[in-house]
Curated annotation (Swiss-Prot):
Keyword tags: ATP synthesis, Cell membrane, CF(1), Hydrogen ion transport, Ion transport, Membrane, Transport
Gene3D superfamilies assigned: N-terminal domain of the delta subunit of the F1F0-ATP synthase
PANTHER family reported for this sequence: ATP SYNTHASE DELTA CHAIN (PTHR11910)
Residue ranges of coiled coil: none
Designated gene of the protein: atpH
Entries under NCBIfam families matching the protein: ATP_synt_delta (TIGR01145), PRK13430.1 (NF009967)
Record carries keyword ATP-binding: no
Record protein name field: ATP synthase subunit delta
Pfam families given in the database record: OSCP
Compartment(s): Cell membrane
InterPro entries: ATP_synth_OSCP/delta_N_sf, ATPase_OSCP/d_CS, ATPase_OSCP/dsu
Functional summary from the UniProt entry: F(1)F(0) ATP synthase produces ATP from ADP in the presence of a proton or sodium gradient. F-type ATPases consist of two structural domains, F(1) containing the extramembraneous catalytic core and F(0) containing the membrane proton channel, linked together by a central stalk and a peripheral stalk. During catalysis, ATP synthesis in the catalytic domain of F(1) is coupled via a rotary mechanism of the central stalk subunits to proton translocation.
Length: 274
């Protein structure tokens, strides 16, 4: 993606992480969100006129969101609906970029599901390895790329190959590529999804402890400050612990930035005692 589309996708990615990684009580499971976003992507791919209408920069964003909600609102859950609205409201350089963004967020949602079971590393590795297997076996590659072969036959083939050998999220992602190649070769599809997985894993996760809950604005400012400090996108996992008295403690890997009142008092007492 280029220009406005790249910026819009980055903003939608951040919104998706906020909704999926830090869900509110009763929120949709991420695997359900991913499946529903894939369904919306498929519908937009099948109806180019609808895709053009939802990506038209001349149409007021609120009208496009209303149209999307009328079309998909009863088919998808609250989190998926909010992400569709985010994508529809954004500005895209190409019409196809809108549906590409929805697919990307669908992949992201499934990766979040894998992360919850501490399996996201396995999923990335399995995607890469299965992609290499497909590329190295012409008969398998041709079977998956064959447009005359019924889709369900290809899905069953994938399920047989991956059964009991891969994480369910890996199976879901490969199945998505087989059902909806979206004009890509198998190699291109695996490269796209592996790239999304790599991007997700490369982010830094900061474990933040505060005495009181942070506001959304405080979260945003802290995330931006840490991202600028480390030169990479930083996601926050925030915990509230009144015992620190005030201030904030940030841990990224082995590095700890301790700005808590409890730490300052302990340091002061130590200096006075020396």
């Amino acid at each position: 993606m280029q220009g406005a589309s790249r910026e819009s996708l980055a903003a939608a990615w951040r919104e998706a992480e906020e909704l999926l990684v830090r869900p509110r009580p009763g929120a949709q499971p991420p695997e359900e969100v991913g499946t529903q976003l894939f369904s919306v992507t498929a519908i937009l791919d099948e109806h180019p006129a609808l895709r053009r209408a939802l990506s038209d920069p001349a149409v007021e964003p609120g009208r496009k969101v209303s149209l999307a909600d009328r079309l998909f609102g009863e088919r998808i859950g609250e989190t998926a609906r909010r992400l569709v609205a985010t994508v529809v409201r954004a500005r895209w350089s190409r019409v196809r970029d809108l549906s590409d963004a929805l697919e990307t967020l669908g992949v992201l949602a499934l990766l979040v599901a894998a992360e919850r079971s501490r399996a996201v590393d396995d999923v990335e590795d399995e995607l890469f390895r299965f992609g290499r297997i497909v590329a190295s076996r012409p008969e398998l590659r041709d079977a998956l790329a064959n447009r005359t072969l019924p889709v369900e036959n290809k899905v069953r083939l994938v399920e047989r190959l991956l059964a009991d050998r891969a994480h369910p999220v890996t199976v879901a992602l490969v199945t998505q590529l087989v059902r909806h190649p979206r004009g890509r070769t198998p190699e291109e599809g695996f490269a796209d999804f592996s790239g999304i997985a790599a991007r997700f894993r490369q982010r830094l996760v900061a474990r933040v402890t505060t005495a009181v809950a942070l506001t959304d604005d405080e979260r945003s400012r802290l995330r931006r400050a840490l991202s600028e400090l480390y030169g990479r996108d930083v996601h926050l996992h925030v915990e509230v612990d009144p015992r620190i008295g005030g201030g904030v403690v940030v841990q990224l890997g082995d590095e700890v930035i301790d700005g808590s009142i409890a730490s300052i008092l302990a340091e002061t007492r130590q200096r006075l005692a020396s």
